[in-house]
């Protein structure tokens, strides 16, 4: 299943939320005060329990069955295998030249995009080693780096940057990887990775005329990380 895309004008409703410190522990409060949890308390961990349970139920036999169903469509199988972390299947398809490493789905996502947004570093490494295009863009202009940064897959993002990914690439909505990380409440590691990069251009604006810092102030508890680049002159060489 493909990850949900970000809408450029999407803004969370923070009017009724209550801010708590990073150290706030709901479980500890539950132990000491029973059911008296303050209204508006929000967990910093975002997850889908139904999806997690579904994933736990899928064993190797299920995956092999899915692969068998797609065997006559190796391109579809490669895209699926990259997303599902089926490294051996990815390696087999590429070694047999059964599918092209930069094959695309209907939204122009490549196997590298899918592995990047799913956080599968070993698959990402294999795809790049086999010639995957780190600059490939989807119909909305997303690169694999955008996909990794949106979902806080920091190790994947770091690997892509080491292999010439454009840290300032902009989508059709003018979103950079930094914009996407800034809108994610769980993105501290990825924000630090991007902001510490000498080539970052934090002043870039999306089509709503917002910088990544603007988005972070509105949506993230880690907006203070942008102090890393405040008042600094970009040291990247002219293009």
List where the protein language model places each region.
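Intrinsically disordered, low-complexity regulatory regions that flank or link repeat-based scaffolds
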Residues: 1-72, 230-239
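Ankyrin repeat start-site detector
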Residues: 73, 106-107, 139-140, 172-173, ...
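Ankyrin-repeat intra-repeat helix-capping/turn positions
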Residues: 85, 119, 152, 185-186, ...
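Conserved ankyrin/ankyrin-like repeat signature
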Residues: 89, 122-123, 155-156, 189-190, ...
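Ankyrin repeat domain, specifically the short helix-to-loop turn at the C-terminus of the second helix
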Residues: 94-99, 125-132, 158-165, 192-200, ...
């Amino acid at each position: 299943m493909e990850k949900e895309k970000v809408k450029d004008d999407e803004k969370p409703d923070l009017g009724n939320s209550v801010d708590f410190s990073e150290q706030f522990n709901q479980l500890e409060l539950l132990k000491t005060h029973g059911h008296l949890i303050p209204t508006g308390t929000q967990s910093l961990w975002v997850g889908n329990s139904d999806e997690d349970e579904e994933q736990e139920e899928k064993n190797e036999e299920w995956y092999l069955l899915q692969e068998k169903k797609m065997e006559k469509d190796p391109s579809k199988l490669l895209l699926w295998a990259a997303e599902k972390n089926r490294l051996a299947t990815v390696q087999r398809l590429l070694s047999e030249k059964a599918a092209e490493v930069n094959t695309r789905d209907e939204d122009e996502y490549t196997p590298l995009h899918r592995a990047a947004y799913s956080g599968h570093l070993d698959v990402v490494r294999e795809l790049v080693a086999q010639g995957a295009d780190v600059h490939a863009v989807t119909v909305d202009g997303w690169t694999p780096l955008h996909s990794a940064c949106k979902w806080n897959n920091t190790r994947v993002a770091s690997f892509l940057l080491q292999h010439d990914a454009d840290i300032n690439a902009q989508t059709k909505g003018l979103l950079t990887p930094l914009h996407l990380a800034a809108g994610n409440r769980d993105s501290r590691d990825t924000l630090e990775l991007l902001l510490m990069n000498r080539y970052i251009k934090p002043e870039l604006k999306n089509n709503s005329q917002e910088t990544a810092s603007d988005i972070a102030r509105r949506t993230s508890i880690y907006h203070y990380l942008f102090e890393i680049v405040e008042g600094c002159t970009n040291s990247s060489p002219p293009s």
